[in-house]
């Protein structure tokens, strides 16, 4: 332990919780830049869309993605016949990043007393906030800066009433996803690669069987114990059950998740201050508070995400609508 120049009184040090720290030195050793990347790791882990969508490199001005349209064909010919000509075409999609941000406010005493726990809590809360906002925008278009999202599809099938009449009790969840919904996709030249379902569908899935009498949803053996979602398979397609998919009567989506791309610009940026004045109210009813006057600390976290759904018709909405209850 260091001592003061008089060699008699112990010097507690600038980071000791008993020292009334002020200014930048208050955060020395608390918020290291290398710890910021963990925020993205948590966000990527929690976001269900980011589990299935393709991640692409993203620059500050966006990304132009080339896309091949049309098929190349070949024909059998006889000796001396004119060779057929085939053409293809390339188009591109420009995807722009959008900023997402949040500010955490806590008392300086709390930070000084237990900095490790404060940072851990903040990491979890930031990750959850970012992931939820991203998924809500990508799935349902809620407060979305992105022009495309899954809910824009017009294809729809009910898990509890596959034929939409409420009169055929012999139809099951298997008929809904593996027959009716799949037919909507393949008849339009689309694929079924993955499925997203809300936790609200668990009672529906628990008793569901395939045509061989096996459970329709087979949970992954290697799912993490504390995972924020359940991972498994339906008809050999990777499937996720999570608590923030549903919106109204829509409880899930199945389709070609290769049509989804997302990216992030650089790393996480954060600022720490105890000198600003923040509006802790709303724009309509502001409540401006001086951090310095009230001995508060604010941490601003920002990130830039991009998302694009290339083909909304490659997805089918799964609902819990029952015609007999309408």
UniProtKB/Swiss-Prot annotation:
Main localisation: virion
Compartment annotation: Virion
Keywords: Capsid protein, Virion
InterPro entries: Phage_capsid (IPR024455), Phage_capsid-like_C (IPR054612)
Top-rank lineage group of the source organism: Viruses
S-S bonds: none
GO CC aspect terms: viral capsid
Pfam families xref list: Phage_capsid (PF05065)
Family: Belongs to the L5likevirus major capsid protein gp17 family.
Subunit structure: L5 head shells are composed of gp17 subunits that are extensively cross-linked.
Name of the protein this chain belongs to: Probable major capsid protein gp17
Organism: Mycobacterium phage L5 (Mycobacteriophage L5)
Gene designation per UniProt: 17
